[in-house]
Amino acid sequence: LLGDMRMIKSPEEIVVMKQAGEIAGAMMQAAEDALGEGRPEYEAALAVINAGTRKAAGFLTDKGWKAFISPMIHNLQIMQSGTDTSMVHRRASVKPLAKGDPVYFCFCNMAQFKQYKLGFDRMFFIKELSDEAAEVQQTAIDAQQEAIAAMRPGVTAGSVAEAANDVYREPG
């Protein structure tokens, strides 16, 4: 029952959801802007927190009960780069970024505002994208599209996964 009720959003909730989206966008842009050859990973994580907090503060007031809503964006940034990109849920470190490094950000545990949480990930590359990295990214996109196309009522999760896995197997 509660799940069904939560599917219907009030105009106020829709405004908050849009604000949360703007905050998430500011966080993602700050992450990209902070990346650079030789810069440590944690600098990008700090930029994400600062940008999200500043954007959230712009939607708040110091009047009435709403004065008690904190703009603070916090948590440990999930971030992997270079040869550590496959280390799922690794946190930002002092490791310097190198030219050509893939840099993966997961904002799922950080992008939240007024109890609305947004889950999204982004991948960036330092200065350049190798042909091999571009092929890997395109394969992932193609597999995702096949999985989406396979989704329909009554289809098992296993068959959806198999549709994606077929795409992954093609290049070898």
Cite the ranges covered by each PLM segment:
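Active-site neighborhoods and metal-handling regions in enzymes and metal-associated proteins
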Residues: 1-172
